[in-house]
């Protein structure tokens, strides 16, 4: 059945206010009858026994003749009316749609009148036996019927569904009613979260919950949201990352932990950024960043196979292969590979990169920017969007990796990776810094950057440093953006398409 047919109705083309008034009048009639009979106009006693998709699956191999020649199979279904042609209706439940056949000869006149007066969007209960039409559609031959919920507003646009993007985001419930693709997107999201949870649990990780409000924002370089605790009369910050709490748990002996939860960053909104977003963050003791790259490859490949049935994932006209192993290249080499005008000496020259950032990238170079910071800017501006197929970028500068362990052979870089696909960062992981003295010094450097005007630099967290002083075993940690991963699997162009209720500007009036 097409979207157009599903939205058809016999209602005349009149204003929405008039349609609403008509529905209120119908509700008044229902209430009057309910009062006379002692029944509720909003009944709540019907118990559904069958779902549309289950019935479609159960009878998919049975022809019209086979169904008619067998003993009747009686069912009880419920759902929202999406089509009402008098002789048959279509209802929609959480699994899909099924037709209801209205036998004009077998139903009382008052029941037929009630069915005729149903509006699209009304929620009904139906009982009857299974049949199949000459066109091959499965239906329920209606023998019993009850209006459960009267819809007082008409569904959006009768023939074209809900196409206004802003309305889709503001009124997601309507989007879910009329757009099957939207429902599929959020079913994929649920499978992604469940799949990650199952994978990590199977690897002996323990799921935990850590605070959402922090005394000191930390765990990432980002601008936080600030709030105030009235009873304690103190400022608090919505968390930008759970990292510092999760590592405390590893200190405490929980050697494999993960958390799936929200982070909040008071930054810009775009097709890939929302101020409130979902992350999976996990930590594994006695592992390094290379172990987590391997784990990530295995987990993403399994998710793609389990959810989509393939490792070749189509996204916005491209096809990304989730079949591991993925490409691995250092940030230094990635800059060279994507900027053929550079020599290795150029990429290692602070003054050369500072001039390039100022003159070619048209970005400010602050006095405190070191070589690592400038390399990171050049990478972000000239390389990131070119990383189409799954790629691990490794060996990030220590200057821009305040929580990562320094590389044993080169202290100016860290044992860190970021994972990119489709030109977007999807994950960030590293061997954790477990030297409390080095960590304290890096926090102090971050404070200096904050004092110099960098709003995203980290605060000094003395309590975390104290926890490290008790001893953090060799550990690796990683965070993966759930929303961006769902975008890939659902072929969604914007992060707002995969968040049920994305943040919007306040609607005037």
Swiss-Prot record:
Q: Name one GO biological process term.
A: lysyl-tRNA aminoacylation
Q: What catalytic activity is recorded? A: tRNA(Lys) + L-lysine + ATP = L-lysyl-tRNA(Lys) + AMP + diphosphate
Q: How is the cofactor bound?
A: Binds 3 Mg(2+) ions per subunit.
Tell whether Transcription is among the UniProt keywords: no
User: Where on this chain does Mg(2+) 2 bind?
Assistant: 425
Q: Which family does it belong to?
A: Belongs to the class-II aminoacyl-tRNA synthetase family.
What is its quaternary makeup? Homodimer.
The identity of this protein, by name, is: Lysine--tRNA ligase
Q: Which organism is it from?
A: Acinetobacter baumannii (strain AYE)
């Amino acid at each position: 059945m097409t979207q157009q047919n599903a939205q058809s109705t016999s209602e005349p083309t009149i204003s929405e206010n008039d349609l609403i008034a008509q529905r209120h009048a119908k509700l008044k009639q229902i209430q009057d009858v309910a009062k006379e009979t002692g029944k509720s106009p909003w009944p709540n006693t019907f118990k559904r026994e069958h779902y549309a998709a289950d019935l479609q699956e159960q009878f998919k191999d049975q022809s019209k003749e086979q169904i008619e020649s067998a003993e009747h199979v009686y069912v009880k279904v419920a759902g929202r009316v999406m089509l009402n042609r008098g002789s048959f209706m279509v209802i929609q439940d959480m699994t899909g749609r099924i037709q209801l056949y209205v036998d004009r000869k077998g139903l009382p006149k008052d029941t037929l009148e009630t069915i005729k007066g149903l509006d699209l969007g009304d929620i009904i209960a139906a009982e009857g036996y299974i049949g199949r039409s000459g066109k091959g559609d499965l239906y329920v031959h209606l023998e019993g019927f009850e209006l459960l919920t009267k819809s007082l507003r008409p569904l959006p646009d009768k023939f074209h569904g809900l196409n206004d993007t802003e309305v889709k985001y503001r009124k997601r419930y309507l989007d879910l009613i009329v757009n099957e693709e939207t429902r599929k997107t959020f079913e994929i999201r649920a499978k992604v979260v469940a799949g990650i949870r199952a994978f990590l649990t199977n690897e002996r990780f323990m799921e935990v919950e850590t605070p959402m409000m922090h005394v000191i924002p930390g765990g990432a370089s980002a601008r936080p949201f600030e709030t105030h605790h009235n009873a304690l009369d103190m400022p608090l910050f919505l968390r930008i990352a759970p990292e510092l709490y999760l590592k405390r748990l590893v200190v405490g002996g929980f050697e494999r932990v993960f958390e799936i939860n929200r982070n909040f960053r008071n930054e810009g909104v775009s097709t890939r950024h929302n101020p409130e977003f979902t992350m999976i963050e996990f930590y594994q003791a006695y592992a390094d960043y290379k172990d987590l790259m391997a784990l990530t490859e295995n987990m993403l490949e399994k998710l793609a196979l389990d959810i989509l049935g393939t490792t070749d994932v189509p996204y916005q006209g491209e096809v990304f292969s989730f079949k591991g192993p993925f490409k691995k290249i250092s940030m230094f080499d990635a800059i060279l590979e994507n900027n053929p005008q550079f020599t290795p000496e150029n990429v290692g020259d602070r003054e050369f990169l500072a001039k390039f950032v100022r003159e070619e990238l048209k970005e400010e170079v602050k006095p405190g920017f070191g070589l690592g910071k400038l390399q990171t800017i050049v990478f972000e501006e000239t390389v990131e969007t070119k990383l189409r197929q799954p790629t691990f970028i490794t060996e990030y500068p220590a200057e821009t990796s305040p929580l990562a362990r320094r590389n044993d052979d080169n202290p100016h870089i860290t044992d860190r990776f970021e994972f990119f696909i489709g030109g977007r960062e999807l994950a960030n992981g590293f061997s954790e810094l477990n030297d409390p003295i080095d960590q304290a010094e890096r926090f102090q450097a971050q404070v200096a950057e904050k004092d110099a005007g960098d709003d995203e630099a980290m605060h000094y967290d003395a309590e975390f440093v104290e926890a490290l002083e008790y001893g953090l075993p060799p550990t690796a940690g990683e965070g993966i953006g759930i929303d961006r991963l769902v975008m890939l699997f659902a072929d969604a162009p914007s992060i707002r398409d995969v968040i049920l209720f994305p943040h919007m500007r306040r609607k005037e009036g």
